[in-house]
Swiss-Prot record:
Function: Delta(14)-sterol reductase; part of the third module of ergosterol biosynthesis pathway that includes the late steps of the pathway. ERG24 reduces the C14=C15 double bond of 4,4-dimethyl-cholesta-8,14,24-trienol to produce 4,4-dimethyl-cholesta-8,24-dienol. The third module or late pathway involves the ergosterol synthesis itself through consecutive reactions that mainly occur in the endoplasmic reticulum (ER) membrane. Firstly, the squalene synthase ERG9 catalyzes the condensation of 2 farnesyl pyrophosphate moieties to form squalene, which is the precursor of all steroids.
Primary enzyme class: oxidoreductase
Transmembrane domains' residue ranges: 14-34, 72-90, 110-127, 148-172, 243-263, 309-328, 369-387
Reactions it catalyzes: 4,4-dimethyl-5alpha-cholesta-8,24-dien-3beta-ol + NADP(+) = 4,4-dimethyl-5alpha-cholesta-8,14,24-trien-3beta-ol + NADPH + H(+)
Activity regulation field: Inhibited by the morpholine antifungal drug fenpropimorph.
This protein's pathway: Steroid biosynthesis; zymosterol biosynthesis; zymosterol from lanosterol: step 2/6
Annotated positions binding NADP(+): K335, R339, L358, W363, N370, Y371, D410, C414, R415, L416, K417, Y418, Y425
Record topology, Lumenal segments: 1-13, 91-109, 173-242, 329-368
Protein name: Delta(14)-sterol reductase ERG24
Pfam families found in the cross-reference section: ERG4_ERG24 (PF01222)
């Protein structure tokens, strides 16, 4: 489908077809191996013992076992399905997203507070009814790798559904141009089945009132990450009768981050994931598998290899985390208020397109100062495991790579969009992410 609304994609990301295939196979395998490695028999004071990748992979059951396991599928589908129903029925304020290419704006229900409150209440009730045993958390901990594999398979099927559905015209409504044509992602309409399936063909796939992309971004993966962390804390306490300060710290740091993201979810509406990227395997796998099953790596590690930090290290790590939060939120708030016309005193560059490029306040320090704050937060999580193993620093390294890629994508887009105005902006704000470093 090629039209004025949906032109043919001519620029490919991630190495095109070969890169899409490599990531679609390599990242899931990497995620499974990573989770297989967090086992007591593979660690002595944080170092690998008798590491054998073949043995690790052989510890995974055949694919047909997971495809046909009704119990695992029931558990995961109930998790996704119940959250989807709650997302639709729980109250929340309705906000408009950014203007789309057809001139329309989609409506989004912002009900993160109601969703978070519901989850906390359910956990509290189950804690009371089971005398603190919480068999659901025990099941999650004991079937961690199996549920990881199920989430990957679910991501595959969800991406396939969204790809096929992208070819079906709008049925119950028309787009902003008065036609039945769906809006496709500019980067996902190449005509190559595998690449478009991976990168995401439809921009905003919806199933009735459910926006699949925004829901997947904020609900099943993020909240499962929280539960996995709690299951690690719960398992360690049941096993040893005590909890180490590092494990408590990781639960606090990441729990704070998760609830902050859910409670401030309206900020997602202007993120590239929502405004620009289609919803394909890349986002489905990232949201549903990579986030919960690799971001929880620190908690998983500390549940099998405890670390006692002491209050000095705890305070230092907290300071790094809150510094990151301050930079991240202050910078984002400043840019948001500037766009709303509340901070007209800040210096900016007037572009030929009629918009302004902010180059003052936080945004005089670097082009993506918010990325630096976000990365400091990620570093604090890894530091909670101290320097026992490089494995737990995976997230900080991965996140740095992700932020660099986003920065380069944004820079390429802005060069094309603003031309000489962007060159002037780069002269005034030369640093990309970290002031005086990069």
């Amino acid at each position: 489908m090629v039209s004025a609304l949906n032109p043919r994609t001519t620029e490919f990301e991630f190495g095109g077809l070969i890169g899409a295939l490599g990531i679609s196979i390599g990242l899931p395998v990497f995620t499974i191996i990573l989770n297989q490695m967090i086992r007591p028999d593979y660690f002595i004071k944080g170092f690998f013992q008798n590491f054998d990748i073949v043995e690790l992979w052989n510890g995974i059951k055949p694919l047909r076992y997971y495809l046909g396991n009704r119990e695992l599928w029931t558990v995961y589908c109930l998790w996704y399905g119940i959250l989807a129903v709650l997302d639709v029925i729980l109250p929340g304020r309705v906000m408009k997203g950014v203007q789309l290419r057809d001139g329309s704006k989609l409506s989004y229900k912002i009900n993160g507070i109601a969703m978070s409150t519901t989850l906390v209440l359910v956990l509290a009730i189950r804690w009371k009814l089971t005398d603190g045993q919480l068999p659901e958390l025990q099941y999650l901990y004991e079937n961690h790798v199996s549920l990881c594999i199920i989430s990957i398979l679910f991501s595959f099927f969800l991406a396939t559904y969204c790809y096929v559905a992208s070819f079906i015209p709008l049925i119950f409504k028309k787009n902003g141009n008065g036609k039945r044509e769906k809006i496709l992602a500019l980067g996902g309409n190449s005509g190559n089945i595998i690449y478009d399936w991976f990168i995401g063909r439809e921009l905003n796939p919806r199933l009735g009132p459910l926006d699949i992309k925004m829901f997947s971004e904020l609900r099943p993966g993020m909240l499962l990450w929280l539960l996995i962390n709690l299951s690690c804390l719960h398992h360690h306490y049941l096993k040893t009768g005590k909890i180490n300060d590092a494990l408590v710290l990781v639960n606090f740091l990441q729990g704070f981050y998760i609830f902050d993201g859910v409670l401030n979810e309206e900020g997602v509406l202007t993120m590239m994931d929502i405004t620009t990227d289609g919803f394909g395997f890349m986002l489905a796998f990232g949201d549903l598998s990579l986030v919960p099953f690799t971001y929880s790596l620190q908690a998983r590690y500390l549940s099998v290899s405890p670390v006692e930090l002491g209050w000095v290290k705890v305070v230092g790590i907290l300071a790094i985390m809150f510094l990151g939060f301050h930079i991240f939120h202050s910078a984002n708030k400043q840019k948001s208020e500037f766009r709303q016309g509340k901070l007209e005193n800040l210096k900016s560059i007037q572009t030929k397109r009629g918009t302004k490029l902010l180059c003052d306040g936080w945004w005089a320090k670097s082009q993506h100062i918010n990325y630096f704050g976000d990365w400091l937060i990620s570093l604090s999580w890894c530091l909670a495991t101290w320097f026992q193993t490089p494995l737990t620093y995976y997230y900080s390294l991965y996140f740095a790579t992700l932020l660099l890629h986003r920065q380069q994508r944004d820079e390429h887009k802005c060069r094309l969009k603003y031309g000489e105005n962007w060159e002037e902006y780069e002269r005034k704000v030369p640093y990309k992410i970290i002031p005086y470093v990069y």
